[in-house]
Protein backbone atom coordinates (compact mmCIF):
# COMPACT_ATOMS: atom_id res chain seq x y z
CA UNK A 1 0.00 0.00 0.00
CA UNK A 2 1.00 3.64 0.07
CA UNK A 3 4.08 4.58 2.05
CA UNK A 4 3.28 7.05 4.83
CA UNK A 5 5.66 9.97 5.36
CA UNK A 6 5.57 12.43 8.26
CA UNK A 7 6.39 15.78 6.65
CA UNK A 8 7.72 17.39 9.84
CA UNK A 9 10.29 14.62 10.30
CA UNK A 10 11.72 14.81 6.78
CA UNK A 11 14.92 16.62 5.85
CA UNK A 12 14.77 19.20 3.06
CA UNK A 13 16.29 16.68 0.66
CA UNK A 14 13.80 13.99 1.71
CA UNK A 15 10.94 16.44 1.16
CA UNK A 16 12.12 16.98 -2.42
CA UNK A 17 12.33 13.22 -2.94
CA UNK A 18 8.85 12.82 -1.47
CA UNK A 19 7.43 15.13 -4.16
CA UNK A 20 9.54 13.80 -7.03
CA UNK A 21 7.91 12.18 -10.05
CA UNK A 22 8.95 8.85 -11.59
CA UNK A 23 12.00 9.44 -13.79
CA UNK A 24 11.85 8.84 -17.53
CA UNK A 25 14.57 6.89 -19.28
CA UNK A 26 17.24 9.06 -20.91
CA UNK A 27 17.19 6.68 -23.88
CA UNK A 28 13.68 7.79 -24.84
CA UNK A 29 14.87 11.03 -26.44
CA UNK A 30 17.34 9.20 -28.70
CA UNK A 31 14.74 6.63 -29.71
CA UNK A 32 12.17 9.32 -30.50
CA UNK A 33 14.67 11.33 -32.54
CA UNK A 34 15.32 8.22 -34.63
CA UNK A 35 11.58 7.73 -35.19
CA UNK A 36 11.14 11.37 -36.23
CA UNK A 37 14.06 11.12 -38.65
CA UNK A 38 12.58 7.98 -40.21
CA UNK A 39 9.26 9.70 -40.82
CA UNK A 40 10.93 12.78 -42.28
CA UNK A 41 13.06 10.68 -44.63
CA UNK A 42 10.64 7.94 -45.67
CA UNK A 43 7.17 9.40 -45.14
CA UNK A 44 4.33 6.89 -45.49
CA UNK A 45 6.71 3.94 -45.77
CA UNK A 46 8.14 4.77 -42.35
CA UNK A 47 4.64 4.91 -40.88
CA UNK A 48 3.79 1.45 -42.20
CA UNK A 49 7.14 0.07 -41.00
CA UNK A 50 6.98 1.68 -37.55
CA UNK A 51 3.40 0.53 -37.01
CA UNK A 52 4.47 -3.02 -37.83
CA UNK A 53 7.45 -2.68 -35.48
CA UNK A 54 5.69 -1.16 -32.47
CA UNK A 55 2.04 -2.18 -32.86
CA UNK A 56 2.71 -5.47 -34.68
CA UNK A 57 0.11 -4.59 -37.26
CA UNK A 58 0.34 -4.74 -41.05
CA UNK A 59 -1.77 -1.73 -41.99
CA UNK A 60 -3.91 -1.91 -45.10
CA UNK A 61 -4.24 1.87 -45.12
CA UNK A 62 -3.11 4.90 -43.12
CA UNK A 63 -6.22 7.03 -43.57
CA UNK A 64 -9.48 5.48 -42.44
CA UNK A 65 -11.86 5.25 -45.42
CA UNK A 66 -14.77 7.67 -45.30
CA UNK A 67 -17.35 4.89 -45.50
CA UNK A 68 -15.99 3.29 -42.32
CA UNK A 69 -16.49 6.56 -40.46
CA UNK A 70 -20.00 7.01 -41.85
CA UNK A 71 -21.04 3.40 -41.17
CA UNK A 72 -19.60 3.13 -37.65
CA UNK A 73 -22.24 2.11 -35.12
CA UNK A 74 -22.19 1.75 -31.33
CA UNK A 75 -24.67 0.69 -28.60
CA UNK A 76 -27.36 3.21 -27.71
CA UNK A 77 -26.20 3.70 -24.12
CA UNK A 78 -22.69 4.59 -25.30
CA UNK A 79 -24.10 6.95 -27.92
CA UNK A 80 -26.27 8.65 -25.31
CA UNK A 81 -23.33 9.04 -22.93
CA UNK A 82 -21.15 10.55 -25.67
CA UNK A 83 -23.95 12.91 -26.67
CA UNK A 84 -24.42 14.07 -23.08
CA UNK A 85 -20.69 14.68 -22.69
CA UNK A 86 -20.60 16.62 -25.96
CA UNK A 87 -23.34 18.86 -24.57
CA UNK A 88 -21.55 19.87 -21.38
CA UNK A 89 -18.12 20.14 -22.99
CA UNK A 90 -19.53 22.30 -25.79
CA UNK A 91 -21.32 24.60 -23.32
CA UNK A 92 -18.17 25.21 -21.31
CA UNK A 93 -15.92 25.79 -24.30
CA UNK A 94 -18.46 28.10 -25.95
CA UNK A 95 -18.23 30.25 -22.81
CA UNK A 96 -14.49 30.66 -23.42
CA UNK A 97 -14.83 32.16 -26.89
CA UNK A 98 -13.12 35.57 -26.78
CA UNK A 99 -14.60 38.77 -28.15
CA UNK A 100 -12.73 41.10 -30.48
CA UNK A 101 -12.05 44.24 -28.43
CA UNK A 102 -10.96 47.76 -29.34
CA UNK A 103 -9.25 50.40 -27.24
CA UNK A 104 -7.87 53.89 -27.82
CA UNK A 105 -4.49 54.20 -26.11
CA UNK A 106 -3.99 57.84 -27.10
CA UNK A 107 -5.64 60.45 -29.28
CA UNK A 108 -5.45 59.20 -32.87
CA UNK A 109 -4.57 55.59 -31.99
CA UNK A 110 -6.89 52.59 -31.80
CA UNK A 111 -5.87 48.98 -31.24
CA UNK A 112 -8.12 45.99 -31.90
CA UNK A 113 -7.61 42.43 -30.73
CA UNK A 114 -8.70 40.01 -33.44
CA UNK A 115 -9.01 36.26 -32.85
CA UNK A 116 -8.83 33.64 -35.58
CA UNK A 117 -9.02 29.83 -35.50
CA UNK A 118 -5.82 27.93 -36.20
CA UNK A 119 -6.24 26.64 -39.73
CA UNK A 120 -4.87 23.08 -39.41
CA UNK A 121 -4.86 21.22 -36.10
CA UNK A 122 -3.74 17.69 -35.32
CA UNK A 123 -5.42 15.74 -32.52
CA UNK A 124 -3.78 12.74 -30.88
CA UNK A 125 -5.78 10.14 -28.96
CA UNK A 126 -3.73 7.42 -27.22
CA UNK A 127 -4.44 3.73 -27.56
CA UNK A 128 -5.81 3.30 -24.05
CA UNK A 129 -4.58 -0.27 -23.43
CA UNK A 130 -6.99 -1.66 -26.06
CA UNK A 131 -9.90 0.51 -24.90
CA UNK A 132 -11.30 3.51 -26.80
CA UNK A 133 -10.33 6.78 -25.09
CA UNK A 134 -13.39 8.61 -26.35
CA UNK A 135 -13.09 11.33 -23.73
CA UNK A 136 -9.61 12.31 -24.94
CA UNK A 137 -11.05 12.81 -28.41
CA UNK A 138 -13.98 14.91 -27.16
CA UNK A 139 -11.72 17.13 -25.06
CA UNK A 140 -9.74 18.08 -28.16
CA UNK A 141 -12.27 17.91 -30.97
CA UNK A 142 -14.97 19.99 -29.29
CA UNK A 143 -12.86 23.08 -28.53
CA UNK A 144 -11.38 22.80 -32.04
CA UNK A 145 -14.89 22.80 -33.46
CA UNK A 146 -16.04 25.66 -31.21
CA UNK A 147 -12.98 27.70 -32.20
CA UNK A 148 -13.84 27.15 -35.86
CA UNK A 149 -10.67 25.33 -36.97
CA UNK A 150 -11.37 24.41 -40.62
CA UNK A 151 -9.01 21.42 -40.88
CA UNK A 152 -8.99 18.91 -38.01
CA UNK A 153 -7.10 15.63 -38.35
CA UNK A 154 -7.02 12.78 -35.87
CA UNK A 155 -4.28 10.23 -35.25
CA UNK A 156 -4.91 7.24 -33.01
CA UNK A 157 -3.30 3.78 -32.84
CA UNK A 158 -4.94 0.86 -34.68
CA UNK A 159 -6.13 -2.33 -33.03
CA UNK A 160 -4.66 -5.76 -33.79
CA UNK A 161 -6.56 -5.86 -37.10
CA UNK A 162 -5.40 -2.41 -38.14
CA UNK A 163 -8.79 -0.83 -37.48
CA UNK A 164 -9.99 2.04 -35.31
CA UNK A 165 -12.55 1.34 -32.59
CA UNK A 166 -16.04 2.31 -33.71
CA UNK A 167 -16.64 4.37 -30.56
CA UNK A 168 -13.79 6.64 -31.66
CA UNK A 169 -15.15 6.81 -35.20
CA UNK A 170 -18.65 7.73 -34.01
CA UNK A 171 -17.34 10.36 -31.58
CA UNK A 172 -15.15 11.84 -34.31
CA UNK A 173 -18.10 11.93 -36.70
CA UNK A 174 -20.26 13.71 -34.13
CA UNK A 175 -17.51 16.28 -33.64
CA UNK A 176 -17.12 16.98 -37.35
CA UNK A 177 -13.83 15.13 -37.92
CA UNK A 178 -13.59 13.14 -41.13
CA UNK A 179 -9.81 12.86 -41.54
CA UNK A 180 -8.61 10.02 -39.34
CA UNK A 181 -5.30 8.17 -39.49
CA UNK A 182 -4.64 4.76 -37.94
CA UNK A 183 -1.26 5.83 -36.59
CA UNK A 184 -0.04 6.00 -33.00
CA UNK A 185 3.02 6.84 -30.96
CA UNK A 186 5.87 9.20 -31.74
CA UNK A 187 5.51 8.42 -35.45
CA UNK A 188 2.00 9.93 -35.43
CA UNK A 189 3.33 13.15 -33.91
CA UNK A 190 6.13 13.29 -36.48
CA UNK A 191 3.70 12.67 -39.34
CA UNK A 192 1.42 15.52 -38.27
CA UNK A 193 4.35 17.85 -37.60
CA UNK A 194 6.13 17.36 -40.93
CA UNK A 195 3.52 15.79 -43.19
CA UNK A 196 3.88 12.75 -45.44
CA UNK A 197 2.41 11.69 -48.77
CA UNK A 198 -0.85 10.86 -46.97
CA UNK A 199 -0.79 12.79 -43.70
CA UNK A 200 -1.58 16.49 -43.65
CA UNK A 201 1.06 18.73 -42.07
CA UNK A 202 -0.65 20.68 -39.29
CA UNK A 203 0.08 23.96 -37.55
CA UNK A 204 -0.42 22.72 -33.99
CA UNK A 205 -0.61 19.31 -32.31
CA UNK A 206 -2.81 18.49 -29.33
CA UNK A 207 -3.39 15.58 -27.00
CA UNK A 208 -1.88 13.46 -24.23
CA UNK A 209 0.22 10.35 -24.59
CA UNK A 210 2.96 8.19 -23.14
CA UNK A 211 6.55 9.30 -22.63
CA UNK A 212 7.37 8.70 -26.32
CA UNK A 213 4.49 10.87 -27.49
CA UNK A 214 5.33 13.61 -24.99
CA UNK A 215 8.99 13.57 -26.04
CA UNK A 216 8.04 13.70 -29.72
CA UNK A 217 5.77 16.68 -29.12
CA UNK A 218 8.54 18.48 -27.27
CA UNK A 219 11.04 17.85 -30.08
CA UNK A 220 8.83 18.93 -32.98
CA UNK A 221 7.83 22.06 -31.06
CA UNK A 222 11.42 23.34 -30.94
CA UNK A 223 11.96 22.71 -34.65
CA UNK A 224 11.07 25.65 -36.89
CA UNK A 225 9.91 23.15 -39.54
CA UNK A 226 7.79 21.21 -37.04
CA UNK A 227 4.57 22.23 -35.32
CA UNK A 228 3.46 24.02 -32.18
CA UNK A 229 2.01 21.93 -29.35
CA UNK A 230 -0.58 22.45 -26.64
CA UNK A 231 1.54 21.42 -23.65
CA UNK A 232 3.83 18.62 -22.43
CA UNK A 233 1.09 16.28 -21.16
CA UNK A 234 2.75 13.24 -19.63
CA UNK A 235 1.83 10.59 -17.03
CA UNK A 236 -1.32 11.39 -15.08
CA UNK A 237 -1.35 12.42 -11.42
CA UNK A 238 -3.63 13.45 -8.57
CA UNK A 239 -3.01 15.10 -5.21
CA UNK A 240 -5.71 14.96 -2.54
CA UNK A 241 -5.88 17.26 0.48
CA UNK A 242 -8.15 15.73 3.13
CA UNK A 243 -9.23 16.66 6.64
CA UNK A 244 -10.25 14.29 9.43
CA UNK A 245 -13.90 14.34 8.32
CA UNK A 246 -13.12 13.05 4.82
CA UNK A 247 -14.51 9.66 3.82
CA UNK A 248 -11.56 7.22 3.42
CA UNK A 249 -13.60 5.14 0.98
CA UNK A 250 -14.01 8.15 -1.33
CA UNK A 251 -10.33 9.07 -1.02
CA UNK A 252 -9.15 5.57 -1.88
CA UNK A 253 -11.51 5.42 -4.85
CA UNK A 254 -10.16 8.71 -6.23
CA UNK A 255 -6.55 7.59 -5.76
CA UNK A 256 -7.22 4.31 -7.56
CA UNK A 257 -9.06 6.06 -10.38
CA UNK A 258 -5.88 7.94 -11.17
CA UNK A 259 -3.48 5.07 -10.51
CA UNK A 260 -5.18 2.83 -13.09
CA UNK A 261 -4.12 5.15 -15.92
CA UNK A 262 -0.71 3.49 -16.07
CA UNK A 263 2.33 2.31 -14.13
CA UNK A 264 3.97 5.74 -14.31
CA UNK A 265 0.95 7.57 -12.86
CA UNK A 266 1.38 9.09 -9.40
CA UNK A 267 -1.07 9.71 -6.56
CA UNK A 268 -0.40 11.63 -3.35
CA UNK A 269 -2.61 12.14 -0.31
CA UNK A 270 -1.98 14.93 2.20
CA UNK A 271 -3.82 14.46 5.49
CA UNK A 272 -3.64 15.67 9.08
CA UNK A 273 -3.14 12.42 10.94
CA UNK A 274 -2.11 8.77 10.66
CA UNK A 275 -5.54 7.38 11.50
CA UNK A 276 -7.04 8.57 8.21
CA UNK A 277 -3.92 7.45 6.33
CA UNK A 278 -4.30 3.92 7.70
CA UNK A 279 -8.01 3.86 6.89
CA UNK A 280 -7.26 4.92 3.31
CA UNK A 281 -4.65 2.18 2.95
CA UNK A 282 -7.19 -0.36 4.17
CA UNK A 283 -9.70 0.87 1.61
CA UNK A 284 -7.09 0.68 -1.14
CA UNK A 285 -6.62 -3.02 -0.38
CA UNK A 286 -10.36 -3.67 -0.39
CA UNK A 287 -11.14 -1.77 -3.59
CA UNK A 288 -8.11 -3.03 -5.51
CA UNK A 289 -9.34 -6.58 -5.07
CA UNK A 290 -12.19 -6.11 -7.55
CA UNK A 291 -10.54 -3.78 -10.09
CA UNK A 292 -9.31 -5.00 -13.47
CA UNK A 293 -6.09 -3.01 -13.88
CA UNK A 294 -4.49 -4.21 -10.69
CA UNK A 295 -0.99 -4.57 -12.17
CA UNK A 296 -0.99 -0.96 -13.39
CA UNK A 297 -2.32 0.15 -10.02
CA UNK A 298 0.31 -1.71 -7.99
CA UNK A 299 3.15 -0.20 -10.01
CA UNK A 300 1.61 3.26 -9.79
CA UNK A 301 1.16 3.03 -6.02
CA UNK A 302 4.83 2.13 -5.69
CA UNK A 303 5.57 5.64 -7.02
CA UNK A 304 3.05 7.22 -4.66
CA UNK A 305 2.69 8.12 -1.00
CA UNK A 306 0.67 9.59 1.86
CA UNK A 307 2.05 12.72 3.52
CA UNK A 308 1.10 13.45 7.13
CA UNK A 309 1.11 17.20 7.65
CA UNK A 310 -1.19 19.13 10.00
CA UNK A 311 0.16 22.63 9.32
CA UNK A 312 -2.10 24.32 6.75
CA UNK A 313 0.61 26.70 5.56
CA UNK A 314 2.91 23.75 4.88
CA UNK A 315 0.09 21.87 3.17
CA UNK A 316 -0.29 24.79 0.76
CA UNK A 317 3.46 24.87 0.18
CA UNK A 318 3.40 21.17 -0.70
CA UNK A 319 0.54 21.64 -3.16
CA UNK A 320 2.02 24.68 -4.89
CA UNK A 321 5.48 23.14 -5.01
CA UNK A 322 4.19 19.91 -6.57
CA UNK A 323 1.79 21.75 -8.95
CA UNK A 324 -0.52 18.75 -9.47
CA UNK A 325 -2.41 17.97 -12.65
CA UNK A 326 -5.50 17.23 -10.54
CA UNK A 327 -6.04 18.58 -7.02
CA UNK A 328 -8.96 17.35 -4.91
CA UNK A 329 -9.67 19.42 -1.79
CA UNK A 330 -11.68 16.91 0.23
CA UNK A 331 -12.32 19.12 3.22
CA UNK A 332 -15.43 20.38 5.00
CA UNK A 333 -14.96 23.98 3.76
CA UNK A 334 -12.81 23.79 0.61
CA UNK A 335 -13.60 27.11 -1.10
CA UNK A 336 -11.24 29.38 0.94
CA UNK A 337 -8.31 27.21 -0.13
CA UNK A 338 -8.76 28.06 -3.81
CA UNK A 339 -7.49 31.64 -3.56
CA UNK A 340 -4.23 30.32 -2.10
CA UNK A 341 -3.60 27.76 -4.85
CA UNK A 342 -1.20 29.12 -7.47
CA UNK A 343 -0.28 25.98 -9.40
CA UNK A 344 -2.73 23.23 -10.38
CA UNK A 345 -4.18 21.91 -13.62
CA UNK A 346 -7.70 21.69 -12.19
CA UNK A 347 -9.17 21.77 -8.68
CA UNK A 348 -12.09 19.67 -7.40
CA UNK A 349 -13.96 20.95 -4.35
CA UNK A 350 -15.53 18.79 -1.66
CA UNK A 351 -16.17 15.13 -1.01
CA UNK A 352 -18.62 14.66 -3.90
CA UNK A 353 -16.26 16.08 -6.52
CA UNK A 354 -14.98 12.83 -7.98
CA UNK A 355 -12.17 13.49 -10.44
CA UNK A 356 -13.87 10.98 -12.74
CA UNK A 357 -16.68 13.47 -13.31
CA UNK A 358 -14.18 16.01 -14.61
CA UNK A 359 -12.63 13.40 -16.87
CA UNK A 360 -15.91 12.84 -18.67
CA UNK A 361 -18.97 14.96 -18.08
CA UNK A 362 -18.57 18.25 -16.17
CA UNK A 363 -17.53 20.01 -19.38
CA UNK A 364 -14.16 21.26 -18.17
CA UNK A 365 -11.22 20.04 -20.23
CA UNK A 366 -9.25 17.08 -18.93
CA UNK A 367 -6.16 17.66 -21.07
CA UNK A 368 -4.05 19.23 -18.34
CA UNK A 369 -0.42 20.07 -17.59
CA UNK A 370 1.45 17.33 -15.72
CA UNK A 371 4.94 16.91 -14.25
CA UNK A 372 4.82 20.31 -12.57
CA UNK A 373 4.02 22.22 -15.76
CA UNK A 374 0.92 23.62 -14.04
CA UNK A 375 3.30 26.27 -12.70
CA UNK A 376 3.38 27.88 -16.13
CA UNK A 377 0.78 26.12 -18.29
CA UNK A 378 -3.01 25.95 -18.19
CA UNK A 379 -5.43 23.20 -19.13
CA UNK A 380 -6.58 22.95 -22.73
CA UNK A 381 -9.24 25.47 -23.76
CA UNK A 382 -10.88 27.04 -26.78
CA UNK A 383 -8.19 29.73 -26.82
CA UNK A 384 -5.51 27.11 -27.49
CA UNK A 385 -7.13 26.51 -30.88
CA UNK A 386 -7.02 30.19 -31.79
CA UNK A 387 -4.47 32.88 -32.51
CA UNK A 388 -4.72 36.57 -31.70
CA UNK A 389 -3.32 39.49 -33.63
CA UNK A 390 -3.64 43.22 -33.14
CA UNK A 391 -4.87 45.78 -35.64
CA UNK A 392 -3.37 49.24 -35.07
CA UNK A 393 -4.84 52.39 -36.61
CA UNK A 394 -2.66 55.53 -36.34
CA UNK A 395 -3.62 58.92 -37.76
CA UNK A 396 -1.88 62.25 -38.32
CA UNK A 397 -2.70 63.51 -34.83
CA UNK A 398 -0.94 60.53 -33.27
CA UNK A 399 2.13 61.09 -35.46
CA UNK A 400 2.27 64.72 -34.30
CA UNK A 401 1.75 63.94 -30.61
CA UNK A 402 3.68 60.70 -30.14
CA UNK A 403 6.01 60.62 -33.14
CA UNK A 404 8.78 62.60 -31.39
CA UNK A 405 8.71 60.16 -28.45
CA UNK A 406 8.98 57.22 -30.85
CA UNK A 407 11.94 58.91 -32.58
CA UNK A 408 13.71 59.54 -29.26
CA UNK A 409 13.35 55.91 -28.19
CA UNK A 410 14.51 54.66 -31.61
CA UNK A 411 17.60 56.89 -31.47
CA UNK A 412 18.36 55.67 -27.93
CA UNK A 413 18.50 52.15 -29.36
CA UNK A 414 20.65 53.24 -32.32
CA UNK A 415 17.91 52.50 -34.87
CA UNK A 416 18.00 55.58 -37.06
CA UNK A 417 15.92 53.99 -39.83
CA UNK A 418 13.11 53.61 -37.30
CA UNK A 419 13.39 57.29 -36.40
CA UNK A 420 13.53 58.22 -40.08
CA UNK A 421 10.18 56.49 -40.77
CA UNK A 422 8.52 58.89 -38.33
CA UNK A 423 10.56 61.98 -39.28
CA UNK A 424 9.52 61.68 -42.94
CA UNK A 425 5.87 61.68 -41.88
CA UNK A 426 6.40 64.69 -39.63
CA UNK A 427 8.11 66.49 -42.51
CA UNK A 428 5.13 65.74 -44.75
CA UNK A 429 2.84 67.23 -42.13
CA UNK A 430 5.03 70.32 -42.05
CA UNK A 431 5.89 69.92 -38.38
Swiss-Prot record:
Reaction equation(s) it catalyzes: L-histidinol + 2 NAD(+) + H2O = L-histidine + 2 NADH + 3 H(+)
Ligand binding (Zn(2+)): 258, 261, 359, 418
Cellular component aspect of the GO annotation: cytosol
Binding positions for substrate per the UniProt entry: 236, 258, 261, 326, 359, 413, 418
Cofactor note: Binds 1 zinc ion per subunit.
Record-stated family: Belongs to the histidinol dehydrogenase family.
Protein name, entry field: Histidinol dehydrogenase
Amino acid sequence: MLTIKNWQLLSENDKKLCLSRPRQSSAIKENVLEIINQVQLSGDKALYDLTKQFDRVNLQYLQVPQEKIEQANIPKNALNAITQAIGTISSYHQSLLPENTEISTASGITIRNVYRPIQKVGLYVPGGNKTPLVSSLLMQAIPAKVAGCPIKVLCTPPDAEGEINEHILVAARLCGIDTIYAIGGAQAIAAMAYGTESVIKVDKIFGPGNSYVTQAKTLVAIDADGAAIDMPAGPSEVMILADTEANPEFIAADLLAQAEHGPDSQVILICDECELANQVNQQLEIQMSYLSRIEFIKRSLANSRIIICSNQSEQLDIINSYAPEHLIINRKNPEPWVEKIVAAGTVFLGSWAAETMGDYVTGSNHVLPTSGFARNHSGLSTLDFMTRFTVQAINQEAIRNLGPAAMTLAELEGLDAHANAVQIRLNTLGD
